[in-house]
Amino acid sequence: MVIVWYHQLLLVLLIFIGAAKGAQYIGSGASQPNRTDVVWMVPSWTCKNEYSIDVEKYGILQNEDQHFVGGKQFAIFYEHSFGKIPYFKAQNESDPKNGGLPQMGDLEAHLIQAEKDINETIPDENFNGIAVIDIEEFRPMWELSWGPFSVYKTESIRLTRQQHPYWSTKQIEWQAERDYEKACQKFFIETLRLGKRLRPNAKWGYYLFPKCNGDVGQKSDTDCSTLFQKFNDNLHWLWGESTALFPSIYLYPSQKQNPEYNFVNSGALITETKRIKRNYCPSCEIHVFTKIEYNPYYTPDDFYSKQNLASTLDLAIKMNANSVVIWSTSQSIGSRCGSLQTYVDNTLGPYLQLTDRNLDKCRMERCEGRGECYLPRPKTNPAIYNFACRCERPYFGKSCEYRGRRMGVSMPKASQTPQVIPDVTAYFSTSSNGTKKYNAPNQFYSRTGGDIKLARKL
């Protein structure tokens, strides 16, 4: 009897493990797979009448009336008008704001003002869109403070030398770095915590993070450098507090003629962002920022080519970011309405519709109509076999071909009537004296291909 019990249990375990191998089943506690949203973060509310821009007909999400305040899709907080964030304007040491250095800022005063700003910008306490904090005047790591940002190193060392005039240069530099990073962490973390407390359903994070080296692809590399991966790993304290990641794959005029190179850069950053999510904040959403104008400030009529849409927006969609955010400035928006409208209707909108049709086709052919296709890795002109599937409940498998449930799995193809194999724990109960009792029926199963059927009973 013990031998029979052992073989029955072993068979159930083998069936369960074999069925689950390679599964992409989401599970009852996780959300269903969704296709990437596209969000219109362009302040085009002034575009009226014949120049109004209707992005919703292309499936693009927007705030009500395309406003930046009080909407349901997004809110963005810029350092110059949010709280009392300390910084040197344009990295100029002679123009400090709110103390200039983070270690000279007033965190309490900042949080008081930031609370007012959040309540004003997001009046809905149940807001569940993206909440982006945009701090670009300084970087929260000493090692990242190069070029114009080195002013924060210079001024931090100057401050520490004033505080400790008899210390050695090495001691001063060590303490300056420590004080700077500690102050940065306080401002970044406490601001996030405030936002999460006031609007707990929002997706909070900092624009431009994670980061990647901009020269990916110049040699034969396709990933962010080891150095930048280390920088991102050292920001673990930031990922632990974030609920969203907001990398930027913006293109600029100097990049417009290099769509292949741009593709590698975009793919490397999205891949790195997924690594950070996987290792440090599995519950974080990924919202990728992109543009449609190379330089909306000086050449607003110079829009992305279709090749560069493929290298940015299209790639982020196929790699299944939670959303792709199309951003632009409000500068001279009134005079840009006509060209924006033309580009949306003639290029951007039709391109998104084509991408959607291709993903619909992939869904049916690759995922048997039961999941969403996505690219695990960047791939130019991907074939259908380059895509993987995120399966809808209760399906799983490489092509969502199997049907399962939380307490177990079923091995027959989903198109067949499933015979569910219960979870192994269902075969046991605990008696009053604490011993485990085996409750499995006296029967054996046999497997032919993907089918399992009752072979015989004892």
Swiss-Prot record:
It holds the Pfam family Glyco_hydro_56. Disulfide bonds join 362-373, 367-389, 391-400. One of its GO terms (molecular function) is hyalurononglucosaminidase activity. InterPro entries: Aldolase_TIM, EGF-like_dom, Glycoside_hydrolase_SF, Hyaluronidase. The keyword RNA-binding does not apply. It comes from the Eukaryota. Keywords: Disulfide bond, EGF-like domain, Glycosidase, Hydrolase, Signal. One of its GO terms (biological process) is chondroitin sulfate proteoglycan catabolic process. Residues 358-401 form the EGF-like domain. Its EC number is 3.2.1.-. Residues 1-22 form the signal peptide. Optimum pH is 6.0. Belongs to the glycosyl hydrolase 56 family. Endo-beta-galactosaminidase that specifically hydrolyzes chondroitin, releasing GlcUA-beta-(1->3)-GalNAc-beta-(1->4)-GlcUA-beta-(1->3)-GalNAc as the main product. Also hydrolyzes to a lesser extent chondroitin sulfates (CS-A, CS-C) and hyaluronic acid. May regulate the function of chondroitin in cell division. This is Chondroitin hydrolase.
